[in-house]
């Protein structure tokens, strides 16, 4: 049998190490599913709801907070029967069109107020409450306030049931979970946190869905 050349051996070693690294790095990666067990797809409308319904409140929507003149802050409704506004997920990079846990995504509402330039989620720093909060729009909606560029992601929740959202700052290795903060406003703010994450599920929104839904748990 003809012996393999050093170049061929190097190639096979490279392929082996690469595949081994991918196997380990993707060990905990899985396709994101909605509440009914169906795969989540980009461009489809979903409601983001708490995994456990009740006093935890309802879905997420938009509201006006602090000194902002436009309702661009993402809030969780206090009423458990409210499903909020549907969102859609966008994969900004070339992909097979499948959302896995950890996939960098953009999140955007399917409707927005006229005073907001964009319906895409972003993060802004509220200096009054010293929190990095989730909102929509652009820098013009947050005069004198720092906004952070980056991408969101979906991960399995630590409890093993449902998911959590995360945000990774552009150009930085920093990624934080999305949690909730109660500032005695019209709803609970979604904010970046190193502590308790917001445990959520995704329910596909039908074209004729009303504002109210039944409890999922």
Curated annotation (Swiss-Prot):
GO terms for molecular function: serine-type endopeptidase inhibitor activity. Its main location: secreted. Keywords: Disulfide bond, Glycoprotein, Protease inhibitor, Secreted, Serine protease inhibitor, Signal. GO terms for cellular component: extracellular region. Coiled coil: none annotated. Transmembrane segments: none annotated. Expressed in roots, leaves, epidermal layers of elongating stems, meristems and in the vascular system. Disulfide bonds join 70-115, 168-175. PROSITE patterns: SOYBEAN_KUNITZ. It is found in: Secreted. Glycans are attached at residue 191. InterPro entries: Kunitz_inhibitor_STI-like_sf, Prot_inh_Kunz-lg. Residues 1-26 form the signal peptide. Belongs to the protease inhibitor I3 (leguminous Kunitz-type inhibitor) family. Might act as a protease inhibitor involved in plant defense responses. PANTHER family: KUNITZ FAMILY TRYPSIN AND PROTEASE INHIBITOR PROTEIN, KUNITZ TRYPSIN INHIBITOR 2. This is Kunitz-type trypsin inhibitor-like 1 protein. It comes from Pisum sativum.
